[in-house]
């Protein structure tokens, strides 16, 4: 059995955050490991505007997938929230969008800023019928302006 493991290890403010995505061949096809959850944090609020951009300078893109067979999931609701250029959270830096017919998404923002000892990050919450809600965070590598970040969901039982 072949395993392909992709590690992204951004190191910021002395803390290491590891995100991994592995796919393995199986008789039934591919299996994707679920995206690791991360804390919701105290700044989440529902009802963010429907939009794919809250700034310029950083692009986060990827595919929403099922962990069961690694296939793309369409119409997944993806919520983003992050700090603005001043390091503060606010409604101007919240967005809701949906994965497209290929399961992909593309989100434009400013480069997130650190605050209260936390490294720069983008909060993400993904919901879609038939799957467990995913709450995670993306930690940009210092000095980058874009990243690929697949969101792999676990089916409800």
Where are these regions (language model features)?
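Beta-strand-dominated extracellular/periplasmic modules and repeats
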Residues: 25-157
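Bacterial N-terminal signal peptides
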Residues: 9-19
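Bacterial N-terminal signal peptides that target proteins for export
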Residues: 1-11
């Amino acid at each position: 059995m072949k395993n392909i493991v992709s590690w992204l290890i951004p190191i910021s403010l002395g803390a290491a955050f590891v995100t991994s995505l592995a796919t393995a061949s199986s008789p039934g096809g591919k299996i994707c490991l679920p995206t690791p959850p991360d804390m919701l944090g105290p700044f989440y609020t529902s009802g963010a505007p429907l939009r794919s951009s809250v700034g310029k300078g950083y692009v986060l893109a990827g595919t929403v997938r099922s962990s069961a067979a690694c296939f793309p999931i369409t119409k997944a609701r993806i919520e983003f929230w992050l700090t603005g250029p001043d390091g503060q959270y606010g409604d101007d830096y919240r967005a809701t969008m949906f994965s497209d017919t290929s399961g992909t998404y593309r989100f434009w923002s400013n480069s997130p800023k650190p605050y209260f000892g936390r490294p720069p990050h983008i909060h993400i919450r993904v919901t879609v019928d038939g799957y467990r809600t995913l709450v995670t965070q993306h930690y940009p590598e210092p000095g980058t302006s874009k990243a690929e970040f697949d969101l792999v969901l676990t089916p409800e039982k």
